[in-house]
Design a protein with these regions (language model features):
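P-loop NTPase nucleotide-binding/switch module
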Residues: 170-209, 213, 240-295
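Short beta-strand elements
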Residues: 18-24, 283, 387-390
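Residues immediately C-terminal
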Residues: 110, 303-304, 310-311
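Basic, amphipathic alpha-helical bundle interface domains used for macromolecular binding and assembly
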Residues: 39-44, 59, 66-76, 289-290, ...
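Peripheral, non-AAA+ core regions of ATP-driven protein-machinery
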Residues: 1-218, 222-228, 331, 471-472, ...
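Walker B catalytic acidic pair
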Residues: 300, 306-307, 318
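Walker A/P-loop
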Residues: 219-260, 325
Length: 512
């Protein structure tokens, strides 16, 4: 008897419905076709054990399973439940009239229990698009899938619940999540604030500019100056995620398997801080069976690279293209996968190996040329892609007690949101551009023209600092953001001057 069940394969952050055809007929063979990987092929033993534990047996007949479309590779053990239900229906142990209305996914334990799977949100979205009535999956994943409206999501703990459901012996209660309530209830939850950091007003201003325009930034300063503390507070001044951004971010983390049982939607901007020993693949994504890397997990949020020169040169260089394209394409012999990677890069570094070059109170012990050699670990092309360079001078301990209360993140965020709203209006007719950092050179000429005084000031800076053409573009973009924060329609010379001031690492003699 031939029956069909439905599962899904996840490629990138999107899913494709997989039709699982099960034919139970006379014979003794078990055949599995349709480009399954080893984990799928090994499902036979898991299914047999799970069914036996729950009081059922595999049909003592020939079982042929085809998974279509055949050109898409089916990976992992997430098809176990769908395969098992198809086999039981083919052996006439289970009623199959309703099977075509549901997508069924789940990894089986040997005792019939279900283990959580990855990529649930993209699968649920695809199931709704294809007109399925419901989605049956492990209970641990139910809240994540229930974010999708107009789709009945049934979380189950074991295969017997599914069998009884299709045989009409019991009912399943759908998991219900109010997506908007879930989103808005968690959107502003944060236990850290900009006001936690005493002093460093010039650095906070640079971070405000970076947040307002979506600019990449690098902070250079000695140990203990507050680089990491400031970086961790950047999400608190960024605009809240929109619902669309939250769904896109959650899809990426769903594919990576980072959504826990109690989470349905990621409502806050991601903050990723990988260790400097990270590999190329872990940073940008990939592998034999591609997974999103840190740059994609930081999509719509912040990627913080602490001690930037300590990262391997190859790791930093593979990041150059995603910084420009805001996506990463992973190509293999038979397929390619694209992951979004639109993030704000925040980097920090010591000015030299000992960390005390230019320190007001400590002497640097690094010899001549060592400082420049240390800085040269960061290539020019990568540094050009970082819009803002800011030097941090540590605040003396005795002055901290005298300082007034610092500004709250909420106040800074309000200014950032106002500037972002200006940019949203500016780029409303341009696809893929939402903030000043994303402008192309052509768009700069339209949206960020400079007057004669500003052009002359910038020309002198270009000659004196020997800046590249890319650095020129970065200065214009940053100046446009500063003008937006000032609610100025045109870029003034003071905006250009401040933007030039944020190119510390371009200055001749900065490192000796």
């Amino acid at each position: 008897m031939l029956v069909k069940t439905f599962g899904a394969a996840v490629q990138g952050i999107n899913a494709t419905i997989v039709t699982i055809e099960v034919n139970v007929s006379q014979g003794i063979r078990f055949l599995h076709v349709g480009l399954p990987d080893n984990a799928v092929k090994e499902s036979h033993e898991r299914i047999a054990s799970a069914l036996e534990f729950c009081g059922f047996k595999l049909p003592r007949k020939q079982i042929v399973i085809n998974m279509a479309p055949a050109d898409i590779r089916k990976e992992g053990s997430a098809y176990d439940l769908s395969l098992a239900i198809g086999i039981l229906a083919g052996g006439e142990t289970l009623q199959f009239e309703e099977l075509d209305k549901y997508v069924i996914m789940g990894e089986l334990s040997l005792d019939g229990g279900l283990q959580p799977i990855k990529g649930v949100l993209p699968i649920a979205i695809k199931a709704r698009e294809e007109g399925f009535k419901g989605f049956i999956l492990p209970k641990q994943n139910a809240r994540e899938a229930a974010v999708v409206n107009n789709l009945d999501v049934y979380g189950v703990e074991n295969i017997k619940e599914v069998i009884d459901f299709f045989n009409g012996d019991s009912t399943l209660e759908p998991t219900i999540v109010n997506t908007r309530d879930e989103f808005f209830s968690n959107i502003n939850l944060s236990d850290i604030d900009f006001s936690d950091v005493k002093g460093q007003e010039n650095v906070k201003r640079a971070l405000e500019v970076a947040a307002a325009g979506g600019h990449n930034i690098i902070m250079v300063g000695p140990p203990g100056a507050g680089k990491s503390m400031l970086a961790k507070r950047i999400p608190s001044i960024l605009p809240p995620l929109s619902l669309q951004e939250a769904l896109e971010t959650t899809k990426i983390h769903s594919v990576a398997g980072n959504i826990d049982n109690n989470t349905s939607l990621i409502s806050q901007r991601p903050f990723r801080s990988p260790h400097h020993t990270i590999s190329d693949v872990a940073l940008v994504g990939g592998g034999a069976f591609p997974q999103p890397g840190e740059i994609s997990l930081a999509h719509n949020g912040v990627l913080f690279l602490d001690e930037l020169p300590e990262f391997k040169r190859t790791v930093l260089e593979v990041m150059r293209q995603p910084l420009e394209d805001r996506k990463i394409c992973i190509s293999r012999a038979k397929f390619s996968i694209e992951y979004p990677a639109s993030f704000m890069l925040v980097a920090s570094m010591n000015p030299c190996p000992c960390g005390y070059y230019n320190h007001p109170d400590r002497d640097c012990v690094c010899g001549p040329g060592i400082v420049q050699k240390y800085l040269s670990r960061i290539s020019g092309p990568l540094l050009d892609r970082i819009d803002i360079h800011i030097e941090i001078i540590p605040v003396p301990f005795e002055k901290m007690a005298e300082m007034r209360e610092s500004e709250l993140s909420e106040l800074v965020r309000n200014r950032v949101i106002k500037a972002r709203n200006i940019q949203e209006q500016r780029f409303k007719d341009i696809d893929g551009v939402y903030c000043n950092a994303q402008m192309t050179s052509k768009q700069q000429r339209t949206f960020a023209p400079t007057d004669k005084a500003s052009s002359e000031l910038l020309k002198n800076a270009m000659q004196r600092l020997n800046l590249s053409a890319r650095a020129y573009d970065r200065i214009i973009k940053v100046a446009r953001t500063i003008a937006d924060l000032d609610d100025s329609e045109n870029i003034q010379s003071n905006h250009i001057a401040e933007a030039i001031n944020y190119r510390n690492l371009d200055r001749e003699g900065w490192a000796g």
